[in-house]
């Protein structure tokens, strides 16, 4: 199924709306292009609804959050919901500040997300307020290991059931789960913690099923 959907993305090259982190905006645009889609980075409230209308998916990333883009995220997210577009949330740094935590929770209340992608501390913060985010990184105490993997998978599935979204928790071991099943990916490498933004690239390509 994935191979067919990926081929369809390359064939139809859908436009993807990104309201994203300025730190990695160029990398995210290039990732969308590498997947065969086409990126547009638009975060002014005056145009985000128009831009979302002509796109096939929306990626919201709160990494460089400010009061102006909060409004834009809400407008674009609600418009995407009306249009039936998939919407991805990357709650970067949720738990590190009250603004980030409050904004991520408000987005969850007001926008229906198809996928929620974060590190374990960010996702724990959204689920229960119990995450211990270290800036924009997961705290060592939260990290997913082979020893706590079963409980982490159960947590991801429970949060997916609660939000009706696919939950992707990234780290040394990635977990991708819906309410019924989960997949674990062991492709992490210690060097990934030495550069910024590798996790953000996962969320940029988010087109709807182009078989429609």
Language-model features: locations:
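Glycine-rich phosphate/adenosyl-contacting loop at the front of the ribokinase-like
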Residues: 1-41
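Active-site cofactor/substrate anionic-group-binding motifs, chiefly glycine-
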Residues: 36-79
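Glycine/small-residue-rich loop that forms an oxyanion/phosphate-binding "nest" at active or ligand-binding sites
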Residues: 80, 85-109, 115
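Conserved phosphate/ATP/ADP-binding segment of small-molecule kinases
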Residues: 100-182
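Short glycine/threonine-rich catalytic loop with a Thr-x-Gly-x-Asp
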Residues: 189-204
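Single conserved hydrophobic/aromatic residue that forms the stacking wall/gate
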Residues: 207-212
């Amino acid at each position: 199924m994935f191979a067919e959907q990926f081929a369809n993305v390359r064939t139809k090259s859908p436009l993807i709306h990104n309201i994203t982190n300025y730190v990695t905006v160029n990398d995210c645009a290039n990732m969308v292009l590498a997947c065969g889609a086409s990126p547009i980075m638009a975060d002014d409230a005056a145009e985000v609804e128009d831009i979302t209308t002509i796109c096939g998916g929306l990626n919201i990333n709160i990494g460089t959050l400010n009061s102006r883009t909060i409004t834009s995220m809400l407008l674009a997210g609600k418009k995407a919901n009306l249009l039936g577009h998939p919407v991805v949330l990357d709650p970067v740094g949720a738990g590190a500040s009250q603004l980030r935590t409050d904004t991520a929770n408000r987005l969850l209340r007001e926008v229906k997300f198809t996928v929620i992608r974060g590190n374990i501390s960010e996702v724990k913060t959204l689920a229960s307020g119990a995450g211990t985010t270290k800036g924009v990184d997961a705290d060592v105490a939260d990290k997913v290991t082979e020893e706590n993997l079963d409980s982490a998978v159960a947590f991801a599935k429970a949060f997916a059931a609660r939000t009706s979204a696919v939950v992707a928790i990234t780290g040394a071991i990635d977990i991708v789960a819906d309410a019924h099943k989960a997949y674990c990916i062991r492709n992490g490498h210690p060097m990934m913690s030495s550069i910024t933004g590798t996790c953000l690239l996962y969320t940029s390509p988010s087109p709807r099923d182009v078989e429609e």
